[in-house]
């Protein structure tokens, strides 16, 4: 296929080199991950090292993995490379097209992959207790807008509305996930008028209220937060520190 030819010409490996599973609760990936079809063009997407670690630790080959905020397709690519069946959902048609293009390569595995438009708050097409692992990266309320006016796009919601709606997401996660299986959610905090708004821990409490138990709280360092230019000026002006970490919550049903 054309994608494989392009990767060969650019000498892009199909799998990461010298990969090792993370063994503690602080993760840092200065290298974004340069294998297969991964890139950082989709704003706010996560490093492929994150879903790879989650998928390899909390699932096995041929398991069903769900990402209901599929975005730029990073989790989808990692599911394919690790031989997991995959369901990718997003409310944004543009995200679905990007994900499909990212999956346009051949590798040694051929898992079942389904990419569909849908709403993470209502996964009616997915049966109860049918998913082995949820691995997803929701928007952080309205920090980054992924569309201008798509109805139901949670990236357009202010924090109060977002937290109400993430409760519906948590309930759907609990419904579709099998008992004793895991749900991984990456979430970050934000600031309003110089004060930290703990979006991540509010989200954690909401998932616990839906029935989940918190197995791990992982601090993920951000490496695109440089104290230069605009950010340095505002840090000094408002006397506040740059938020340079996110939280990866591992929940168990």
Language model features by range: what are they?
Residues 1-253:
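Class I S-adenosyl-L-methionine-dependent methyltransferase catalytic core
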């Amino acid at each position: 296929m054309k994608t494989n030819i392009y990767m060969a010409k650019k000498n892009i490996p199909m799998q990461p080199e010298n990969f090792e599973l993370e063994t503690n609760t602080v993760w840092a990936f200065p290298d974004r991950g340069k294998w297969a079809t991964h890139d950082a063009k989709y704003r706010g997407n996560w490093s492929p090292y994150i879903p790879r670690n989650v998928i390899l630790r909390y699932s096995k080959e041929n398991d069903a993995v769900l990402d209901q905020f599929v975005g730029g397709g990073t989790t989808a690519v990692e599911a394919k490379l690790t031989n997991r069946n995959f369901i990718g959902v997003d409310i944004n048609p543009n995200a679905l097209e990007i994900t499909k293009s990212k999956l346009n390569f051949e590798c040694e595995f051929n898992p079942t992959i389904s990419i569909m438009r849908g709403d993470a708050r209502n996964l009616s097409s997915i049966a109860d207790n049918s998913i082995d692992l949820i691995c997803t990266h929701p928007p952080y309320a309205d920090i980054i807008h992924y569309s201008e006016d798509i109805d139901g796009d949670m990236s357009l919601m202010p924090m109060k509305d977002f937290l109400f709606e993430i409760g519906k997401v948590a309930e759907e996660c609990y419904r579709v996930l099998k008992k004793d299986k895991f749900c991984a959610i990456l979430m970050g905090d934000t600031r309003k008028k110089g004060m930290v708004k703990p979006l991540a821990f509010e989200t954690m409490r909401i998932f616990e209220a839906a029935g989940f138990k918190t197995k791990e709280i992982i601090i993920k360092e951000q490496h695109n937060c440089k104290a230069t230019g605009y950010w340095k000026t505002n840090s000094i002006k408002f006397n506040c520190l740059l938020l340079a970490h996110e939280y990866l919550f591992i929940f168990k049903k």
